[in-house]
UniProtKB/Swiss-Prot annotation:
Function: Ligand for members of the frizzled family of seven transmembrane receptors. Functions in the canonical Wnt signaling pathway that results in activation of transcription factors of the TCF/LEF family. Functions as a upstream regulator of FGF10 expression. Plays an important role in embryonic lung development. May contribute to embryonic brain development by regulating the proliferation of dopaminergic precursors and neurons.
Any single GO CC term annotated in Swiss-Prot or TrEMBL for this entry: cytoplasm
Keywords: Developmental protein, Disulfide bond, Extracellular matrix, Glycoprotein, Lipoprotein, Secreted, Signal, Wnt signaling pathway
Any one Gene Ontology molecular-function term assigned to this protein's record: cytokine activity
Protein name (record): Protein Wnt-2
Post-translational modification summary for this protein: Palmitoleoylation is required for efficient binding to frizzled receptors. Depalmitoleoylation leads to Wnt signaling pathway inhibition.
UniProt main location, coarse: secreted
CDD domains the UniProt entry points to: Wnt_Wnt2 (cd19345)
Positions annotated with a glycan in the UniProt record: N295
Length: 360
């Protein structure tokens, strides 16, 4: 019994490194890094050489990406607001989400997709606002074109989403492309699904010109929809995410359950089932649901029964200031009174184990 273990022991650290996936998107930490571009590029942990090259070469793009982190994390938290895992971030952790994303779960699939989408959105918006040296409005949208309503002229500033997608692919995917393992392929797939989701909601907007708005002439441009549309779409993909396994040659996926269809480029994929997130678990990165607010009248994921994992809940009586007796005044204002409202707040009980609140 001891001989095989003795032979394996020197290689154990390497084996553990290979078996344990790494939370590779260290660029997520860019939201917390200030200072000059050189300071930022050299102090974000975990960036690969290609990412550092792009960081030094395009500091204005990096600033846009860093500002965008707050936007897509807020979107993630909005989508998961009624779930046991609520996309909570850890300020002192360079992976931003802690160990929870080490598992190749549905939640990891969503976070990689929405973060990749957030980079596309942030860069494309910065291009249109004239904040970047390397891009501007879409140069291809010039001259005359035709749609179902007739001819129109390209004008205004069409969002240059192709540039946003190209840069996001080069920067976000750089670290995954260095890996050959299953998790890297999963991340690449979900990153691409996120980028495609933003382009899906690119819409044509037009302005009419002519006597009394007769629309004898139209000027049109392409504009991204609000990021909430992308978030809602990816949330639907999260709920329909497809569990996969690596194929035999290690180059792609097959569905884990043969009854399900093969995933498309728009679908999210994952390998491992999620933990229940009921209790604090250091290894799983779960903070648990003790102290979370629950909805006593709901039958959904935010219900006290589901959110509290059957542990029960505490009720506290609180008062809050709200707007009331609002009236419309001509013209054009709405005036309200400040009123105190009494309500009950229900929060999940802690597990009976004495160590549930130990810091992670």
């Amino acid at each position: 019994m001891n001989a095989p273990l003795g032979g394996i022991w020197p290689w154990l650290p390497l084996l553990l490194t290979w078996l344990t996936p790494e939370v590779s998107s260290s660029w997520w930490y860019m939201r917390a890094t200030g200072g000059s571009s050189r300071v930022m590029c050299d102090n974000v942990p975990g960036l690969v050489s290609r990412q550092r090259q792009l960081c030094h070469r395009h500091p204005d793009v990096m600033r846009a990406i860093g500002l965008g982190v707050a936007e897509w994390t807020a979107e993630c938290q909005h989508q998961f607001r009624q779930h046991r895992w609520n996309c909570n971030t850890l300020d002192r952790d360079h992976s931003l989400f802690g160990r929870v994303l080490l598992r190749s779960s549905r939640e990891s699939a969503f976070v990689y997709a929405v973060s990749s989408a957030g980079v596309v959105f942030a860069i494309t918006r910065a291009c249109s606002q004239g904040e970047l040296k390397s891009c501007s409005c879409d140069p291809k949208k010039k001259g005359t074109a035709k749609d179902s309503k007739g001819n129109f002229d390209w004008g205004g500033c069409s969002d240059n989403i192709d540039y946003g997608i190209k840069f996001a692919r080069a920067f976000v995917d750089a670290k995954e492309r260095k890996g050959k393992d299953a998790r890297a392929l999963m991340n690449l797939h979900n990153n691409r699904a996120g980028r495609k989701a933003v382009k899906r909601f690119l819409k044509q907007e037009c302005k009419c010109h002519g006597v009394s708005g007769s629309c004898t002439l139209r000027t049109c441009w392409l504009a991204m929809a609000d990021f909430r549309k992308t978030g809602d779409y990816l949330w639907r993909k999260y709920n329909g995410a497809i569990q996969v396994v690596m194929n035999q040659d290690g180059t792609g996926f097959t569905v884990a359950n043969k009854r399900f269809k093969k995933p498309t480029k728009n679908d999210l994929v994952y390998f491992e089932n999620s933990p229940d997130y009921c209790i604090r678990d250091r290894d799983a990165g779960s903070l648990g649901t003790a102290g979370r607010v629950c909805n006593l009248t709901s039958r959904g994921m935010d219900s006290c029964e589901v959110m509290c994992c059957g542990r029960g809940y505490d009720t506290s009586h609180v008062t809050r200031m709200t707007k009331c007796e609002c009236k419309f005044h001509w013209c054009c204002a709405v005036r309200c009174q400040d009123c105190l409202e009494a309500l009950d707040v229900h929060t999940c009980k802690a597990p009976k184990s004495v160590d549930w609140a130990a810091p992670t």
